[in-house]
Curated annotation (Swiss-Prot):
It is a multi-pass membrane protein. GO terms for biological process: establishment of mitochondrion localization; mitochondrial genome maintenance; mitochondrial outer membrane translocase complex assembly; mitochondrion-endoplasmic reticulum membrane tethering; phospholipid transport; protein insertion into mitochondrial outer membrane. It comes from Aspergillus niger (strain ATCC MYA-4892 / CBS 513.88 / FGSC A1513). It is found in: Mitochondrion outer membrane. HAMAP family: Mdm10. This is Mitochondrial distribution and morphology protein 10. PANTHER family: MITOCHONDRIAL DISTRIBUTION AND MORPHOLOGY PROTEIN 10.
Amino acid sequence: MLDFMDYIQLAFAEATNWNRDNSYSSLTATAQSLLDFSTPERLRVHLSSLSTPHFATSYTLGTVGLIDGSVSYLFSTVPLDKFPSRSALIPLRKLSPGYRQVQAPIAPIAETILINDDLNDASAYTTIGKKATLFHATLHLPPPTTLNALFLRRISPTMQLSLAVCSTRGPPLSKSAPQASLLAQLSHNTGKYNNEYLFSTDNALFGWRGLWNFGPDPRDPVASGSSPRLSLLSAGAEAYYSPVSSLIGMSTGLRFSTANANTPISTFPYTLTLTLTPLTGSLSTTYSLRASPNLAFSSRFGFNVYSWESEMVAGCELWRKSKSRYRDDGDGVEWARRKIRESLFPHPHPHLSTSTPNDIKDLAGHALEKSGKGEEEENESVLKIRVDQSWNVRLLWEGRVKELLVLIDRVVEVYSNERCLRELRLMVVFNLDL
């Protein structure tokens, strides 16, 4: 499950119209979400809140023999109040990554939003995608104290700058300076292709990542006005070099994904990937399929041409909807509205009601609208299963219990025919709306 700060960062990317699927780092994101899902390592409690449309806080406390915690702060120049921030209202699919439908590439454009209620004031508007900025810092409290900071800025509608800093405090009796590292990343996304340039102060590492989408250019007005794509084929590569340690790394990959569109010949959406690391001789293929809106499967096969070692992993996710009778609108007065409706319309039969047809029509439309929203935002839970070639099984259940988001992880690792290791881990998340 994503942390609250990660969810806010995804909301920032969505608010600024940044396509995170158009990146080589997201080439195998669908298979990784279904097969390499993260699990809680200990009993951990998260308390988070979007205090203002521009400011968010998060506190974490964990304990299993050793008490630790962290404090996080986030500031965004783009208002994020349009995104739900309470744990009872955030769609669980936003927090628990699963099968991810690859978005079709679009040409980045600059958009304007209203930042206050004065429509006639020119200063009431700001430009999204040009000067949008995000600051994020997390301080891990127990020794050794570690500070993680992130600076994100949209230089232009097609370029984004990211600076990540990690600093660790040294031993108490040591007088040496804290260990720190900086990772700078410049992304250039045109829709047709995406280039990322990286530099890390660790061993002076330089890197490049690129992704190319086959097909029409989304920047072309003629291509953008044509029929939507039914599939997408992308090719990418990455390369790294460190002059200090003489480290060289490279990889390349392909991705084919079908769109979830209404076509005369409808098929299940699926994603195929092929990645190759020439220096190490590693070859990996993945196949992910969404059999229904609530069921998805994925498999991965890896092979090394040098050592002849192989790996095979399979997994699936199953979503379960738990419908609630009433949905809280978040303003605390839904009970009053329900009482008024029951007093005005005590009889369900239309012939026994004294209301006019227009009133009945308006009420029915309002009820259908609320019912549709309730189905989209109703309480959900998901069960993820992963098994490898050694029959090591991992189960993860994520769901809601009242206002809490709960994760329960079950791990069974087989060491021999007679011995196995079983672990049960738990994490609780609670988001406030102050």
